[in-house]
């Protein structure tokens, strides 16, 4: 019997504390600031992934191109790009540094550059360890934010996903800005947000397959030290402990109903060779895929900063 999931513990250096700015639109008492922010956010839709795609030249990565990508990320919390040739791992990190992404987050399957090769390793990994980690298979990957199993003071704030080789079929990535999810929850019932910001609303239990792995409790939504909204979420039903109450059941039902099908605010992205996206850790999922003679290979880099 294989364990279906593995979490990667990281050292906790300090307890997380933050005091949101008094005029934050994400504080429930700030209705005026919220309405202004909300109206501006929703005015960016509808949007087409083709219209926000930024084409880049690896030999001339100029400020104008980077600013176009940053502008998209500021609007939708992600941006899509396409390079004109294959990139090295070193160049991927250099590219991210242009967006001020410098503090990469490693894990046990990352290389010396903190880059993870997201490809179907299902057979090899089962044979070697008896553990199946869904991102490293060709299976569907359900809605989540990256690193939701990390403590907040070690959070993943952004990530890059770069396609080196696509699948023969399938493998689309579907993205949903977590700020859109926040808007719909708050507009439906502000108490939902109050509850989702509680520090013990969602718990990830320790993994018995990893020595020293302890449980992690935290909020679903939280405001960080720079006054940005972040989200910890997974649609998984196993190995997740939510607080139990009638209100929390209603909240979960609302969230799962909202993400059950693609909607006006979701982006369906099938990455081609040399394409990728950089995201401020939005909600995302992946469809099942089938490999051809050459395996689907995406490079992933995670960061503790976000694109600003």
Per-region residue spans from a language model:
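N-terminal mitochondrial targeting presequence
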Residues: 1-17
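Active-site environment of non-heme Fe oxygenases that use a 2-His-1-carboxylate facial triad
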Residues: 19-61, 74, 116-271, 276-277, ...
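Polybasic, low-complexity association/targeting segments
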Residues: 62-68
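Short amphipathic alpha-helical segments
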Residues: 65, 87-91, 95, 188, ...
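TRNA-binding/sensing appendages of the translation machinery
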Residues: 70-80
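Structural motif
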Residues: 82-85
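Long, hydrophobic, well-ordered secondary-structure blocks that form the structural core
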Residues: 88-129
């Amino acid at each position: 019997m294989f364990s279906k999931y593995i979490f990667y513990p990281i050292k906790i250096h300090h307890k997380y504390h933050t005091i949101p700015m008094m005029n934050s639109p994400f504080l429930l008492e700030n209705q005026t600031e919220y309405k202004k922010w909300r109206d501006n956010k929703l005015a960016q839709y509808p949007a087409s992934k083709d219209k926000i795609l930024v084409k880049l030249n690896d030999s001339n990565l100029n400020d104008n191109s980077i600013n176009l990508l940053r502008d998209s990320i500021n609007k939708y919390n992600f941006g899509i790009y396409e390079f004109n040739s294959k990139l090295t791992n070193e160049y991927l990190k250099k590219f991210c540094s242009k967006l001020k992404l410098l503090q990469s987050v490693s894990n046990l399957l990352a290389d010396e550059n903190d880059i993870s090769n997201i490809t179907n390793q299902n057979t090899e990994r089962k044979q070697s360890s008896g553990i199946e980690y869904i991102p490293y298979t060709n299976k569907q990957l359900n809605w989540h934010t990256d690193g939701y199993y990390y403590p907040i003071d070690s959070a993943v704030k952004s990530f890059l996903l770069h396609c080196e080789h696509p699948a023969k079929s399938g493998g689309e990535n579907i993205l949903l800005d977590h700020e859109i999810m926040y808007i719909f929850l708050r507009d439906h019932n502000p108490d939902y947000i109050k509850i989702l910001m509680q520090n013990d609303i969602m718990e990830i239990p320790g993994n018995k397959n990893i020595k020293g792995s302890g449980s992690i409790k935290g909020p679903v939504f939280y405001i960080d030290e720079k006054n940005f909204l972040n989200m910890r979420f997974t649609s998984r039903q196993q190995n997740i402990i939510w607080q139990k109450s009638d209100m929390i059941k209603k909240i979960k039902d609302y969230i799962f109903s909202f993400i059950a099908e693609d909607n006006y605010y979701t982006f369906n992205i099938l990455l081609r060779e040399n394409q990728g996206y950089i995201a401020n850790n939005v909600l995302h999922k992946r469809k099942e895929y089938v490999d051809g003679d050459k395996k689907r290979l995406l490079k992933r880099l995670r960061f503790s900063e976000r694109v600003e």
